[in-house]
Amino acid sequence: MSNTTLHATTIYAVRHNGKAAMAGDGQVTLGQQVIMKQTARKVRRLYEGKVLAGFAGSVADAFTLFEKFETKLQQFSGNLERAAVELAQEWRGDKQLRQLEAMLIVMDKDAILVVSGTGEVIAPDDDLIAIGSGGNYALSAGRALKRHASHLSAEEMAYESLKVAADICVFTNDNIVVETL
């Protein structure tokens, strides 16, 4: 990414005890030194509120991908996996889309997927995943919570995992938005 690209964030998603939750922070960073916004909303409800999507990367690029993904959801009657695969194929195959600098996590009540511009659609083995600059911190915290604090709800796990990432990663803030299914 260029030095003037708006980027950096953390998105975390988990399925736990029959519930699903996705959390994202609110920080938008310009380059490596300037916080441009602290209250961005990077987790959205799509397809009549039945699908959650979160992005890490360039904001403008992510909005383009949200629109394309929602179109694919409509086209395939809400089939998350099919819509994600079709988006990844289009993203990888289109010369202009290939330039987009973002990653998505998409989820419904049954599945979590990471979608990237390299054509990858990845389902995590353990019903939790994180992307973005603080993704490894959130993922580590989430795995620990799932193993040792399984009494927490999916929403609580998502919030606390993002909170840990915000405490460590300078590109992640603690203005956390959590959406649940």
From Swiss-Prot:
This is ATP-dependent protease subunit HslV. Belongs to the peptidase T1B family. HslV subfamily. The active site is at 9. Allosterically activated by HslU binding. The keyword Calcium does not apply. Its main location: cytoplasm. Its EC number is 3.4.25.2. The gene is hslV. GO terms for molecular function: metal ion binding; threonine-type endopeptidase activity. It comes from Staphylococcus aureus (strain Mu50 / ATCC 700699). One of its GO terms (cellular component) is proteasome core complex. The keyword Cytoplasm applies.
